[in-house]
Amino acid sequence: MYTIGWGKQQINIKAQGYAMFGYGQWSHRAHGEQTKLYARAVCIQDNQSNLSIICCLDMGCVTHAMRESACQQLHEQLGTVFNDSAFMLTATHTHSAPGGCSHEALYNMPTPGFVPKHLIAVTQAIVSSVMDAWQGLQPTDIHLGSDEFNADTPVAWNRSLAAYNRNPDVTQRTDQQRHLALDRRMNSLGFYRDGKLHALLSLFGVHATCIGNSLDKFDGDNKGYAAAQAESWLTTQGIDAPVAIFAQATAGDVSPHFHGKGALSRRNKIKGDAEYAYAQQNGNYQSDMALSMLSQPPQNIIKGKLDCILSYMNFSAMHVDAEFANGEQNAYTSDPCHGAAFFAGTPVDGLGTPAPIAKGMVLMAKTVKTWRLSGFNKNNPETTYYQRLYASQGPKNIVLEAGRKLILGRALDSPPSVFDPLIHEMNRQVKAGAIVDSPMVPSILPLQILIIGQLALLCCPGEFTTMAGQRLVNTIKPILQTRGIEQVLLCSYCNDYMGYVTTFEEYQEQAYEGGHTLYGQWTLAAFQTGFSHLAKQLIQPVELRVYDQNTRPEPVPAHELALRTNHGNVNTAVHTQ
């Protein structure tokens, strides 16, 4: 038996007209609150006083700034009992929550800019929820439940079927079978006292995009409604202050909206308040499933000690093990790049750039690539760099080189901004000198494994597609089985955010997810390489483990961050003199 506690704290951010994070739309601004947003935490301690902490936010993502700030305060509050390697911070990926919480430049651009009071509020909620959980530690049992949604439960659809069907290790699905082209299994940890369920942690992958970008209120979307529904039901059962965490698994290519013939027409019929109702229904499917499986006699009682490992790795130049790269001996990741498919968006969950402009981007990207690799540039010292970049990025039509801060081979402030306020804001920040040495997106990424008895949890940054996650689990499970691990689960959106992770085959399709897989076609292989190394260390006694414990993202230049810090102007983060 473990000693376990849980807590919940509201994220106190007032809607004041800033853009929300998720859709990347300048016009998607918050002017009200439909539901409250929360941080929910669980503290688990074993009989050797090892402490693991899981905290889930009703937010679009976790940023390094969030995690770093929370870790600093938790160290102060908990002292030596706090181990940042055993602290996992994740998010539900609702697209109707505040932005502006990152020190990197790109994902703050629509907000616009970095909003310190948002980061402070999120950090306060994290720390308060964790401290409530810590102070509530009591003897508690953990049961692992697992079940699949029936095929006729309209909870999720694959939104990138052509990419999914490229995988040789899947059952080929038709347009009418998109609801089967995903992992329909939910895994849930139930926390029991005196045989009664008091709290839970559910893992099921589906985008929190029931609510579109035309609404203007904060909302927890399907995962938030699932948590509220489960907590309400537990309260009716006499449980005091229950906590239900509905976190994400492989949500990358999974939509809560119908995909198939007539998908867009069907989506367009769900508008306004109907979107909130749709999100609530989707959440109810998830809460009903979790409560049903955890109300059954114990399927799998979790017992044993806690363990953990955390390491930050540079995904902009990572050599990939050949076994994960189709035998390729010289496979590398590269500087982060966004493709034309990223800017085009997804057809149902969130359209992006109009099709004619997206096609123009493709043409220009191909032209830039041809010129850079042509014989005319053979004496250019940059040629070697670009040969390696394009070898890594494969078929992606590169529009934004986030690493080198170029758009279609030109400076960031080169695109005309007269018709696009988002481009205008980027131009202003560039001209103000706010992004000279600051990263656009993260490249030093956290890989973490938590061990809870015979269960291992792979804590992954970003958004993994169904098969990318399945392959990662299949890679790590045989390694950890040698130390008695029976179940390996994956949680995504953990500890930082940098876009998507697709399989090599999915990447070749260059759908939205592949266009947003930043480090090239070997990105998944890099995760397999990195996680394999960490898993092998977990087999060793602690004193014999050899891995990088020191690398962390470099602090963003303070003077540049100040130049794009927003103190109340919803139109721009750049201060006018």
Where are these regions (language model features)?
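Non-catalytic substrate/cofactor recognition surfaces at enzyme active-site rims
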Residues: M1-Q577
